[in-house]
């Protein structure tokens, strides 16, 4: 019986390690006009009420929310929840933000969530030019 238990434990460990090795973060798909268009439609359907038409966090109910919705018009590198990283924005859309009004959107397909990522990043202000010395 001890040998059988060892085989079961070893097999379970192997399956766990294999599953962990195969699990990977989703990679961003290539940004295409079609994907961006899809993201803009999803944004209008699901995000405008809080984040506003311009992505400035000034939607119809945005001012009533605490904390205020994210302002996507700041430079992408300055976003609190993203800091210039598309995967971080994808994670926020997928998982939401605890203790805020930002709900998870995991019910959307992976492609739809990436489409939303590209749509909200479109609102970002361009990088400030670097000063020459």
Task: Mark where each language-model region is.
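A short hydrophobic/aromatic micro-motif that marks alpha-helical segments and, especially, helix-coil
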Residues: 17, 112-113, 124-127
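Periplasmic/extracellular electron-transfer cofactor-ligation site
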Residues: 34, 40, 44-67, 99-101, ...
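Extracytoplasmic electron-transfer domains, predominantly the class I c-type cytochrome c fold
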Residues: 66-122
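Electrostatic cytochrome c docking/interface patches
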Residues: 21-42, 131-133
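Positively charged n-region of N-terminal signal peptides that target proteins for export
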Residues: 1-6
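Short, solvent-exposed loop/helix junctions and linker helices
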Residues: 33-37, 41-44, 79-84, 110
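Bacterial N-terminal signal peptides
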Residues: 9-17
């Amino acid at each position: 019986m001890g040998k059988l238990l060892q085989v079961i434990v070893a097999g379970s460990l192997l399956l766990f390690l294999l599953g962990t090795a195969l699990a990977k973060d989703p990679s961003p798909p290539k940004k295409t006009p079609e994907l961006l268009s899809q993201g803009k439609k999803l944004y209008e359907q699901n995000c405008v009420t809080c984040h506003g038409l311009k992505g400035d966090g000034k939607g119809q109910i945005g001012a009533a929310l605490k904390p205020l919705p994210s302002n996507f018009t700041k430079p992408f590198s300055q976003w609190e929840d993203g800091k210039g990283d598309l995967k971080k924005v994808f994670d926020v859309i997928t998982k939401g933000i605890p203790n805020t009004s930002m709900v998870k959107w995991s019910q959307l397909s992976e492609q739809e969530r990436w489409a939303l990522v590209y749509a909200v990043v479109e609102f970002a202000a361009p990088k400030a030019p670097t000063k020459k010395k």
